[in-house]
Amino acid sequence: MKNFLVFCCLTVFFYSCGGSKKLNTGDQWISLFDGKSFNNWKASENPSTFKIEDGMIVANGPRAHLFYEGPVQNHNFKNFELKARVMTTPGSNSGIFIHTNYQETGWPSKGYEVQVNNSQSDWRRTGSLYGIDDVKEVYVKDNEWYTEYIKVEGKNITIKINDKTVVDYTEPANLERPKDALEKRLSSGTFALQGHDPGSKVYFKEILVRPLPD
């Protein structure tokens, strides 16, 4: 009987711990990039566009996108906070896609792009929710590291550059998109880094996510 009571107490304890851990996942930042390999990442159409140098992902080459395909949330995020350290070089364009899916070729059609661009000819600057809520101001310089932060909670997207909020967008309930952009909406999905073109060279490191309750 004593052993049975001990077993019951332990069972309740472990289930409680498991439940607490699930509820508290939003309290922990989880790294998506180990700094050494492309484990859990999958590149599209031109994989050679992405390289690893000194613990950084370097995007430089023909159009390609690097999708997170790892075990965290089974690479299917709905509500979350994401942050990454980013550095652009002069004339470079890139982006971070959210709520997207792996796509073999072309610009990802699902989800939203958060712009990385401090000096390239496209007027939509770093922090823009591309084509939806665009930023004209330049908040950071080329050749300097900055933090790009993205939060999705419900129908709201918050984007910060070095702790400064540059976008606070709420998706309308009666959302309508053109036929060529029907999947540009909040749902759930993974993240992707963009390799825009051979003239663009952008660095990423310290890519962290904090899942939030659905």
Region spans (language model):
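Carbohydrate-interacting regions of secretory-pathway proteins
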Residues: 17-214
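Bacterial Sec-dependent N-terminal signal peptides
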Residues: 1-25
